[in-house]
């Protein structure tokens, strides 16, 4: 069933678990994630983003995302990740995404506020929630180099940002990074604590693939309510491909779906959302 992300993010915040956000851009990933959520009786977020349009036509794939969300036996949110323009997120909304991220984190503070508020002012009257980002979670690179110039979320700006934009949730930059970490992630949990104390909206952790289970649990205990996973699903799928490369293609596809399901199930249980949709 299609669900409202605001309900589940607030529930996660209040009950100290996190809802899993999985980027999906083909049938095997989508079905594997839904399989996992249904088995775990967990709410789940299925998401698409600009980085995947070279592999999949979003305008076509979105129909499958929405259809499977509607038919699922658990609450499912359809989300657009890292929308870097109004045109992009408007297109996502017109194709059935019921949650949007307006990512203007690459801009300075005032421009981030302006662009985020523009999205909020447009989509809130339509009943669509908007996630924003303060600080900047970069893309895959040498992790040590990324840390040298890392733009952490400024806790002193968080309350003003949320108040002026009206965003529904806030992605924080605490040493996390998209893609594969080239060394052990070094997360600044003091930033999470201070931002959590400063704002009332749910907090989001991007780039969580490769972060240790212990650090994930710490982040959740400090108030992270939504956690984004993509790279680990891809890694699980690639292992399945390698192990079944001599098998018929139909068999290989089923094994990829199973591998994605198993990895998604691990994350759902780690985040503590299993059983929440019973």
Curated annotation (Swiss-Prot):
User: Which Gene Ontology MF annotations are present?
Assistant: aldehyde-lyase activity; identical protein binding; tagatose-bisphosphate aldolase activity; zinc ion binding
Quote a single Gene Ontology cellular component term.
Answer: cytosol
Question: Which Gene Ontology biological process is one annotated for this entry?
Answer: carbohydrate metabolic process
UniProt xrefs under Pfam families: F_bP_aldolase
User: Would you say which domain of life the source belongs to?
Assistant: Bacteria
The record's annotation in CDD domains points to: TBP_aldolase_IIB
Q: What is this protein called?
A: Uncharacterized protein YdjI
Which organism's genome codes for this protein? Escherichia coli (strain K12)
Which classification does the entry list for the species? Bacteria, Pseudomonadati, Pseudomonadota, Gammaproteobacteria, Enterobacterales
Q: What gene is this protein a product of? A: ydjI
